[in-house]
UniProtKB/Swiss-Prot annotation:
Localization per Swiss-Prot or TrEMBL: Cell envelope
The protein's name: Biofilm regulatory protein A
Keyword Nucleotidyltransferase attributed: no
Other facts: As a result of luxS inactivation, brpA expression was decreased by 70% in early-exponential-phase cells. Also, brpA expression was down-regulated in response to the deficiency of smu486 and smu487.
Gene: brpA
Role of this protein: Involved in biofilm formation, cell division, autolysis and the regulation of acid and oxidative stress tolerance. May be associated with systemic virulence in blood.
Organism in which the protein naturally occurs: Streptococcus mutans serotype c (strain ATCC 700610 / UA159)
Length: 406
């Protein structure tokens, strides 16, 4: 199962909204909330070491959506991180940014010395498969040249349970055919018939994921995902039943892990970030498509990486990078192909999410491919020559059997 970036945003926004909503509940539900959120806590020791939330400072969060589709997996946290989003929250500027990280970016894996995959070049999403959340966090840190303060990882079952916990939502299928993804993902047999219907969690998942039969493709899917998040948030904010709120918290606690501590002492501090969460701007770090040893990868340009790093560092109050001192473990486009990349200028305008869950922007906000295009190499690293000699001496194929890079 592949989790979409927008669905991950939906789940995390619901999680953050639940945190902010804690302050309006009585002592009994408050104590229950603390108990449920305590189940989600797991610290990998990869953070900055500073208690940024207690100090009410800007902080960063790595959001990971975990692909748990295989029936052979024995843990809900075993698999790939098919979506990774770097979030910055600044209580002073009252701004939050979300930078989606393309899963196929070619990067050097960062991890402990005991992990034999450390130092290998692979797709970004392979970091989780090779070393769990810890390696994923360390790899993104080194790619973006920052320290990640917090992380949140969520599995797909969370969306299903959350929609069911709020009693379902009402949507309208404007197509003249049922919305279904069973042809491409046979494990999902639910569908949404044409017309207006109240749907459950399984149907909401299908409604949010279908794109192949949509004339607008991914843009149409994004539109439906925005519809789902706004309707779930509206129901959460209008809750008048303690039992329903308990179901929501239980769904979150079963399907999420984080090192954000939820306690009686941290909740007042977390509420101080509520204004920053009312306006969320989204971006995407995306590279240029190419083929290496038969595998599809994204190679980021120094221009786009510098732009992303400085936007993130600016939000966190850190010293910005320059073209001369750009630090990263990502494999840069220039190091493979050389040349002047100034003609490369994929769309990077931000999209806005309001506190009501509404969205403005167009599909072009998520970047577009340039004239370099995909499959610009001949499909084998042995064919690289001249300007590409840098790659020949540095590219390593991950160990066999790991599934990394596929």
């Amino acid at each position: 199962m592949k989790i979409g970036k927008k669905i991950l945003i939906m789940l995390v926004t619901i999680f953050l909204t639940s945190l902010v909503a804690l302050g309006v509940y009585a002592t009994s539900i408050y104590n229950f909330s603390l108990g449920e959120f305590s189940k989600t806590f797991k610290d990998y020791g990869t953070g900055s070491g500073k208690d940024v939330i207690a100090d009410e400072k800007p902080f960063s969060i790595l959001l990971m959506g975990v692909d748990t589709g295989s029936s052979e997996r024995t843990s809900k946290w075993e698999g790939n991180s098919d979506s990774m989003i770097l979030v910055t929250v600044n209580p002073k500027t009252k701004k939050t940014t979300m930078t989606s990280l393309e899963r196929d970016i070619l990067v050097k894996l960062s991890g402990s010395k005991t992990n034999d995959q450390t130092g290998y070049d692979a797709k970004l999403n392979a970091a989780y498969a090779a070393g769990g959340a810890k390696m994923a966090i360390m790899t993104v840190q080194d790619m973006l040249d920052i320290k990640i303060d917090k992380y949140v990882q969520i599995n797909m079952e969370g969306l299903v349970q959350l929609v069911d916990a709020v009693g379902g939502i009402t949507v309208t299928n404007h197509f003249d055919f049922p919305i279904s993804i069973e042809e491409h993902e046979p494990e999902f047999t639910a569908s949404v018939e044409p017309g207006t219907h109240k749907i459950n969690g399984e149907q909401a998942l299908v409604y949010s994921r279908m794109r192949y039969d949509d004339p607008d493709g991914d843009y149409g899917r994004q539109k439906r995902q925005r519809e789902v998040i706004s309707k779930v948030l509206k129901k959460i904010l209008a809750l008048d039943s303690v039992s329903k709120y308990r179901k929501i918290l239980s769904a979150v606690s079963k399907n999420m892990q984080t090192n954000i501590e939820i306690s009686s002492s941290t909740i007042p501090k977390l509420l101080g970030y509520s204004d920053a969460l009312k306006s969320i701007r989204t971006y995407q770090l995306k590279g240029e498509g190419t083929t290496i040893d038969g595998g599809s990868y994204q190679l980021v340009t120094s221009k786009e990486l510098l732009k992303a790093q400085n936007r993130i560092k600016g939000q966190l109050g850190l010293k910005k990078s320059t073209a001369e001192n750009l630090k990263t473990t990502a494999s840069l486009y220039e190091n493979f192909y050389g040349g002047d990349t100034s003609i490369y200028d994929s769309s990077s305008s931000a999209s806005d999410y309001s506190s009501s869950g509404n969205y403005s922007g167009s599909s072009s906000d998520y970047g577009s491919s340039s004239s370099y295009g995909s499959n610009s190499s001949s499909g084998s690293s042995s064919d690289y020559s001249g300007q590409n000699s840098y790659n020949q001496g540095n590219y390593q194929q991950p160990a066999a059997g790991t599934g990394i890079g596929n």
